[in-house]
Amino acid sequence: MTTDTIVAQATAPGRGGVGIIRISGDKATDVAMAVLGHLPKPRYADYCDFKNASGQVIDQGIALFFKGPNSFTGEDVLELQGHGGQIVLDMLIKRVLEVEGIRIAKPGEFSEQAFMNDKLDLTQAEAIADLIDATSEQAAKSALQSLQGEFSKEVHELVDQVTHLRLYVEAAIDFPDEEVDFLSDGKIANALYKIIDKLSVVQASAKQGSIIREGMKVVIAGRPNAGKSSLLNALAGKESAIVTEIAGTTRDVLREHIHLDGMPLHIIDTAGLRDTTDTVEQIGIERAWNEINSADRVLFMVDGTTTDAVDPHDIWPDFIDRLPANLGVTVVRNKADLTGENLAMTEEKGYSVYRISAKTGLGVEELKQHLKSLMGYQSNLEGGFIARRRHLEALDVAASHLQLGKEQLEIYLAGELLAEELRMAQLALSEITGRFTSDDLLGKIFSSFCIGK
């Protein structure tokens, strides 16, 4: 870890009412003496002159000094809050850099220092960037929950439970005569099952948090002329796609990024799925399946004038059978203005079925509410947290090792192999909070932060 003292502008570049310069490190006190002529009382606002090396006043403002470790970074921190003109702030940074041993901070380096000094774990540090980058109220609330340690708490509890069970298993291994009795008495199995169940709950919450942060990818799929492009236009609120009566009008993937009450939604319109000899249409259909395979949700668009069926297995079994196993599907029966169907949503064998008219807008608002619900929208979000793709991947790895450990226990009563799977699960979970994380990953994470954060 570097011991350099760093400086950067903490407020956004450009013109503003207030501009803040942040200094962190051992030389922060030297900067205070050079620029202010004195060291402010820790944690007190001090109105004073900011001076250059000749004693001329550069600006006037508030100086705040935080004595380490009682600061955001865990080091001595000095903040100079002056007027927000960029020229003035640049002059002030230039003055600070005249003090020996000071350099400009790299992106995210203040947060990295806080992480290295155990002021934040990795999920909390990431939550700072997520809070700044939040594009909706839901995302901001969830990022704040993560910053306050909600996600970390869940992960730490899992790590503690896995560690405790691992120690119990390894203790049994140390007494080989009793090992089989230990492994078969049910206590280890029950503890393992509880951990797997808890991890499943955390995975579901993290998946929801990832959708809130990154948005949900929804693919509209179905046969040609079912009204897919009309639905895209209805959801987007504009004419994004060309709509005609000619089957196969859409031959490529069309994308729209919208917000439903602040929740980010990525809508993908695809070519109608059918057997065709048209080379261009075949390429479009291949791209459609690529989008479907990476979707968070599929809206299975059905022309209601062609079938009365509501169970997707009855409507088009080959399509449903080809979908990824865990991909959620919502059946959308279109052209309700022609069929006269009741617009009420129904559940059919685990599938939500909506009746709409993409052309007239009938039922589209109810479908939007459904999508918001899938994304975890709540008017008053409590207890949720934000998550990133790397968190989901780490949770998946941990779950995989726990399942392998379960097999070693139930089938082979293999204590050493169970202990190894528990160790691997522990490592995967610890990567989330940064307890065991490679330097390359840390560099990648913090380099995506703003300078000054």
UniProtKB/Swiss-Prot annotation:
CC per GO annotation: cytosol
PROSITE patterns: G_TRME (PS51709)
UniProt domain TrmE-type G: residue ranges: 215-376
Molecular functions per Gene Ontology: GTP binding; GTPase activity; metal ion binding
Organism domain of life: Bacteria
Binding site for K(+): N225, T244, I246, T249
InterPro entries cross-referenced by the UniProt entry: G_TrmE, GTP-bd, GTP-bd_TrmE_N, GTPase_MnmE, MnmE_dom2, MnmE_helical, P-loop_NTPase, Small_GTP-bd
Residues involved in Mg(2+) binding: S229, T250
Disulfide-bond pairs as recorded: none
Keywords, ordered alphabetically: Cytoplasm, GTP-binding, Hydrolase, Magnesium, Metal-binding, Nucleotide-binding, Potassium, tRNA processing
GO biological process terms held by the UniProt record: tRNA methylation; tRNA wobble uridine modification
Keyword Cytoplasm on entry: yes
Cofactor binding mode and count: Binds 1 potassium ion per subunit.
EC number: 3.6.-.-
Protein location: Cytoplasm
Gene3D superfamilies xref list: P-loop containing nucleotide triphosphate hydrolases, Probable tRNA modification gtpase trme, domain 1, tRNA modification GTPase MnmE domain 2
Binding positions (GTP): 225-230, 244-250, 269-272, 334-337
Predominant location: cytoplasm
Cofactor: K(+)
Binding-site positions, (6S)-5-formyl-5,6,7,8-tetrahydrofolate: R22, E79, K119, K453
Function: Exhibits a very high intrinsic GTPase hydrolysis rate. Involved in the addition of a carboxymethylaminomethyl (cmnm) group at the wobble position (U34) of certain tRNAs, forming tRNA-cmnm(5)s(2)U34.
Family according to the record: Belongs to the TRAFAC class TrmE-Era-EngA-EngB-Septin-like GTPase superfamily. TrmE GTPase family.
Assembly: Homodimer. Heterotetramer of two MnmE and two MnmG subunits.
Protein name in the entry: tRNA modification GTPase MnmE
Organism: Shewanella sp. (strain MR-4)
Gene of this entry: mnmE
